[in-house]
Structures are given as C-alpha cells and as structure tokens.
Amino acid sequence: RKGLFQVFRQKPASYDRNRTANLESRMRTADTNRSCGQKSTVRLRTEGHPHPGLRPRSGEERIGDSRPMKMTHSDLVMLRGNHKHAIASHELIRVKRGVAIAAPKQSETLPRWEAFSTAAEARILAVARTMRRKVVFTRESAMLIHGLPCWAQNPCVSIRVAGSFTPSLLPGVIMSTHQIPAVRLRSTHGTYTEAQPQRIGGLLVDSLEETALQMALKARPLDAVIAVSGIIKALSRFDRFRQPASRRHEEIVKAGLLDGLRGLGSIPGKRQAEAVLTLSDAGCETIGEQALLFALATVMPYEIHTQHEVVIREHSYFLDFAIPSLKIAFEFDGFIKMGEDHDSFQRAHRALLSRQRELEDAGWTVIRVAWEELMDLAALRAKLLGRVSKCTSAPIVSPA
C-alpha cells in the first residue's frame, strides 16, 4: 500500500481542477511524450474463471447495480426551423445544434442533480443521432450508458470514431433555474482490450472492462478511483452479505484488469492506472463512499477495510470503512441512506443513533463524513488525521 501513497500523494490544498491536473501530470510516467494514439489490444485473462465478470458480453444485460439511462431516442426533438417559439419560451431545450428535448415536467422543482443528469444523457443521445459515421461511446459517457455514476457532475461526451476527428463544444443548457455549462465533445484513440463494444439502448458503448482501463489510465486520480471501484463492484456483483464469494470475484476481476494493463507495455499513465486498480474496492456501495476511499487512502498509513462486519448482541453491523486494529470506523452519511421523505428520514436517523451508540459501547470510535466534506479533500484529510491522532494519542504521519 505504501506505493499507492506515493502515487496519490497530494499537497494540503483544496481539490480543484488545476491542482488535480498538476498531480496527474506528476503521476504520469516518464514516457508521456509518446503518442497516446497507439492502439494496443490485450485479451483479458478469463480462462478457467468461475465468475464471468471479465468475459466479453453482448446484448443489453444489466450488470450488478447498474441502472440504464432514463432518456431514450424518442425524447429527442430534431429542430427543423419551426421551433423558434418553443425554444424562446423554454418549452424546448437545445442540447446540440439541431437537437432539443422537451422541458421536464414540474421543472420549477427539478433538483439540481437531476437537471445535470438529464443534460448529460440528452447530449449523448444527440451526438449519437447526428453523427454520420459509426461512433462508440467511451469513458464517462460509457459509464452513464452502463448505468454507473461518475464523479464529474457535467461530464464531457467521449466517443471513439475511425479516422480524424475535430473536438467541438456542446452548448450550455438552461433547465429551469439551473445553468449547465457547455462541455466538449472529444474523441479517444485506441483500445486496451479485445472486448467488443456492446449495444445498449441502441448505443454502441465500450465494455466495462475497456472503460475501467480507459478511466484508470486517462482520468484524474479521484475520478479514476471512483469509476474503477464502481465498475469492479458491478463486474463482481459484490454483495456484503456474501463477502467471501464476493471478494473472490473481486480478486478475479482485478487480476484480469491488472494482467491486461501490464501487458500493454510502456504507455502514459500506467503507474497511475496500476495504483488505481490496486486501490479500487468493490465494497464501496455509493459514489460518496468511493470518494471517501480515495481520501482515506491518500492520507492514512493504516490498512483500510471496507464493509467490515461487527457483531454486537447478535446484530451485524457493516462499517463503511474500518481500521480494525484501532477499532476506528469511518461512516459516510449519504442522502440515500437517510431516506427520501420526512418519516423515512426520522426512522433512519433514529436507527443511525442507535447503531452509533452500540458501536461506541463496544469500544469503537465512529468518525462520520458528510457529502459536503467531500468537496474539499484537503480539509477532509486534515479532519481525518486529527481525529485518528486523538484516538491513538500520537500524531499520525501520512506516508510520503
């Protein structure tokens, strides 16, 4: 794990695009001057595997906890010159030149996250509708089509096409009171596996295995860990109530991805990708937990366990993260866990307090992390170090 700390080491500064870009630049291997367009395909190791997680799939099978996109091609409106009034009155929302969608119903109460999600899906469909050649969706776009969340709230649309391609800008979107900035339509070059693209909802999309390597090699560190953790969770069909089998499946998936990566030779981003694949954990159940995993791994000198089971008075509790030797637990307070209405929130809150009391009575220290704290990883790391230092009565030295 020490090697992971060396790769993911960050200065104590807020996580923003510039600092992350600098970090990623430092993490790139010395051969970054080589062309990224070189195609290198490797067959992922699947022989004799008891679990089909790494075998190429076809069709529209749902994987693990994935959810398909809500929008379909039928939601698109092709603009033919007679929609000016509808655009001006915001009945239609332009998502790409010549393509719009109908304004969502009850848009005045539309949550911010749903507005961004709708725009991201509409942009993918609009690109597919208007491209005059075969297009395969990759990276964050592939994740959304597979039904897996990505960290970027407003992701670029990533595609792979044969021949040359000039990146372009997809316009900003105004949806009710939400202003969604413009994003790039960009092309990736080459593939890293022999898995064939899949067709999901009429869209050609990279396999999850290909997407995992694309994200591990090319995405920013935080985005990469979140993406690969989600993909490994889906491929291994992780179930915390069946952990021995789930962990074996997780190891198979990871081994296949690492074998594929190591067979690629010397390529930019390989050091980061190996660290990402090693760190990523199928036991993270939500995108918030995946982000917290990254924060913990880049600051803690201890081995972190996910979904650690603790039995108290015949009750089993699964801790999001734990340092068992110190009896320290880290719990992420996500929105989904707390329910969607007042009554369910109150029930969840009472259960949370009861759970915390039982854990503390059993000698555990529970450190809670809220969603808002993930927005400033430097401050979150400082908090985590401070709390753990108090528990150990000694300062914690973050690995260099």
List the predicted regions and their residue ranges.
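Surface segments flanking catalytic/ligand-binding clefts of nucleic-acid enzymes
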Residues: 53, 73-79, 244-400
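Intrinsic disorder/low-structure terminal segments
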Residues: 4-7, 13, 301, 329-331
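Short gly/ser-rich loop at a beta-strand->alpha-helix junction or flexible surface loop bordering the NTP-binding
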Residues: 3-4, 8, 15-20, 24-268, ...
